Amino acid sequence: MADTTGRIPLWLIGTVTGIIVIGLIGIFFYGSYSGLGSSL
């Protein structure tokens, strides 16, 4: 019995989490490269 109804699928959570993590890392490295993240 797959209870995916009314519940967010696990693959969707993993995909969104991966995109957010990659986005944050990209923003962090971009900020460090452009000098904005040097104060962090």
Swiss-Prot record:
What GO terms describe the biological role, i.e. biological process, of this protein? Answer: photosynthesis
Q: Which organism is it from?
A: Piper cenocladum (Ant piper)
InterPro entries for this protein: PSII_PsbJ (IPR002682), PSII_PsbJ_sf (IPR037267)
The UniProt gene name for this protein comes to psbJ
Q: Which SUPFAM superfamilies match?
A: Photosystem II reaction center protein J, PsbJ (SSF161021)
Q: Subcellular localization, per the record?
A: Plastid, Chloroplast thylakoid membrane
The keyword Cell cycle appears for this protein:
no
Topology versus the membrane: Single-pass membrane protein
Q: What is this protein called?
A: Photosystem II reaction center protein J
Transmembrane domains' residue ranges: 8-28
Subunit structure as annotated in this protein's UniProt entry: PSII is composed of 1 copy each of membrane proteins PsbA, PsbB, PsbC, PsbD, PsbE, PsbF, PsbH, PsbI, PsbJ, PsbK, PsbL, PsbM, PsbT, PsbX, PsbY, PsbZ, Psb30/Ycf12, at least 3 peripheral proteins of the oxygen-evolving complex and a large number of cofactors. It forms dimeric complexes.
Gene3D superfamilies registered for this protein in UniProt: 6.10.250.2070
Q: Which UniProt keywords apply?
A: Chloroplast, Membrane, Photosynthesis, Photosystem II, Plastid, Reaction center, Thylakoid, Transmembrane, Transmembrane helix
According to its UniProt entry, the function of this protein is described as: One of the components of the core complex of photosystem II (PSII). PSII is a light-driven water:plastoquinone oxidoreductase that uses light energy to abstract electrons from H(2)O, generating O(2) and a proton gradient subsequently used for ATP formation. It consists of a core antenna complex that captures photons, and an electron transfer chain that converts photonic excitation into a charge separation.
Q: Where is the signal peptide?
A: none
List the GO cellular component terms.
Answer: chloroplast thylakoid membrane; photosystem II reaction center
Do you know which NCBIfam families this protein is assigned to?
Answer: PRK02565.1 (NF002722)
Q: Which family does it belong to?
A: Belongs to the PsbJ family.
Q: Which Pfam families match?
A: PsbJ (PF01788)
